[in-house]
């Protein structure tokens, strides 16, 4: 395999709106949500209102597909059965719960993007779903007050006359729902998303990207990442990441290989553009994307065969630092996805190992490019080009990209 370059018009991936994973210096965060002066002026165009939808109304909206919860949500469900059950119990008891925050999709009126409350909505769907082939029934567990309902599913409760009142109360329980209409741009939604989650467990904006830019490519990426043992190994997880950091990681590396020359220092916009472009051109580029994902997995196995448990760790003060570094993954995956590079280096693994250690020990610019100001164009360029030059010095047939030194 010689190249993953796509024959697509570059104009297709120029997008004005920038939106959007954990902030480790390489990922998207709130500081990257750049607003133009015009975008600032347009904030007042958004309409925000509150309404009290009943539980039954919300469930009907989910069943109709108007509230999209991700078809593959079961693989990325963050709450346990006990946590879901306690939420259902809170509704049964009429306890106050946090509001759901939705945005009316500007591109598909009548459809809603979930900005806050996804796990609560998933809990309702698990309990009330009318599609049990797709969604296993939630069996209530860990209830403290309504403990007579422990071990019961919604279907079982429906068959018990003594549950009739509780079911009716639950279905008619109002849930405060905040709705945003006419949002001026995607950066607005991203800012709302960030502020809703300030102070809570960090969330991945990849979830929002999946909702804003659904399509064949983003669906493929979700399923591929969820099924990838390699991504679980890289992120040290046993299950798919419920905040979709595995999806973002695969998207990031794919974007660098396909569209590196288009990178302008704005990671959110860069990844967003990739989704838009590949969704639009999915039928023509599907084979190349699938081939890349296959080769990415081989690249990881090759890297592990060289560095073992120290793969994607920087070397500092005589030892490997015990922390995954995305910048090193950028460097290595960019070249090791090429089968001819792997084939050439398979008998030179010790040379690669020692060359990387020497690079970390002697090249302060490379260390800066994987440690600080990592998303800038010079840092991105340097860590990829510099590692390519190291491999080239070993004789590997690498294609080092010619990048603007902006």
What is each PLM-predicted segment?
Residues 4-14, 20-29, 36-37, 41-60, ...:
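Basic- and aromatic-enriched surface patches that contact anionic nucleotides/nucleic acids
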Residues 63:
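Conserved beta-loop-beta/alpha segment of the NTase-like Rossmann-fold superfamily
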Residues 250, 254-406:
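C-terminal subdomains that position terminal phosphate/3'-OH groups for nucleotidyl transfer/ligation
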């Amino acid at each position: 395999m010689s190249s993953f370059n796509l024959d697509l018009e570059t104009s297709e991936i120029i997008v004005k709106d920038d939106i959007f994973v954990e902030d480790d210096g390489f990922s998207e965060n709130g500081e990257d949500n750049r607003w133009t002066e015009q975008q600032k002026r347009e904030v007042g165009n958004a309409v925000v209102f509150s309404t009290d939808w009943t539980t039954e109304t919300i469930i009907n909206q989910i069943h109709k597909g108007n509230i999209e919860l991700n078809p593959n949500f079961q693989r990325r469900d963050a709450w346990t059965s006990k946590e879901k059950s306690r939420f259902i119990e809170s509704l049964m008891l009429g306890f106050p719960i946090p509001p759901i925050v939705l945005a009316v999709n500007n591109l598909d009126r009548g459809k809603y993007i979930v900005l806050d409350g996804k796990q609560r909505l998933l809990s309702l769907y698990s309990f009330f779903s009318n599609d049990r082939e797709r969604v296993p029934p939630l069996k209530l567990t860990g209830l403290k007050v309504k403990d007579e309902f422990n071990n019961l599913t919604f279907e079982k409760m429906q068959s018990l006359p003594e549950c009739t009142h509780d079911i009716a109360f639950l279905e008619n329980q109002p849930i405060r729902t905040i709705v945003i209409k006419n949002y001026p741009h995607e950066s607005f939604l991203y800012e709302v998303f960030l502020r809703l989650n300030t102070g809570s467990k960090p969330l991945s904006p990849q979830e929002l990207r999946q909702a804003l830019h659904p399509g064949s490519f983003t669906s493929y990426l979700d399923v591929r990442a969820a099924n990838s043992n390699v991504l679980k190994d890289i992120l040290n997880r046993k299950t798919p990441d419920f905040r979709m950091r595995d999806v973002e990681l695969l998207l990031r590396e794919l974007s660098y290989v396909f569209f590196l020359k288009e990178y302008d220092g704005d990671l959110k916009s860069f990844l967003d553009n990739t989704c838009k472009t590949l969704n639009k051109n999915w039928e023509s580029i599907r084979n190349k994307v699938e081939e890349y994902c296959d080769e990415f997995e081989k690249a990881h196995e090759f890297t592990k065969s060289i560095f073992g448990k120290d793969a994607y760790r920087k070397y500092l003060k005589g030892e490997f630092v015990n922390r995954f570094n995305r910048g090193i993954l950028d460097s290595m995956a960019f070249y090791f996805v090429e089968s001819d590079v792997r084939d050439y280096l398979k008998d030179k693994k010790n040379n690669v190992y020692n060359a990387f250690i020497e690079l970390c020990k002697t090249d302060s610019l490379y260390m800066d490019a994987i440690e600080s100001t990592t998303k800038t164009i010079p840092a991105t360029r340097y860590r990829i080009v510099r590692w390519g030059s190291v491999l080239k010095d070993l004789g590997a047939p690498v294609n080092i990209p010619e990048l603007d030194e902006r």
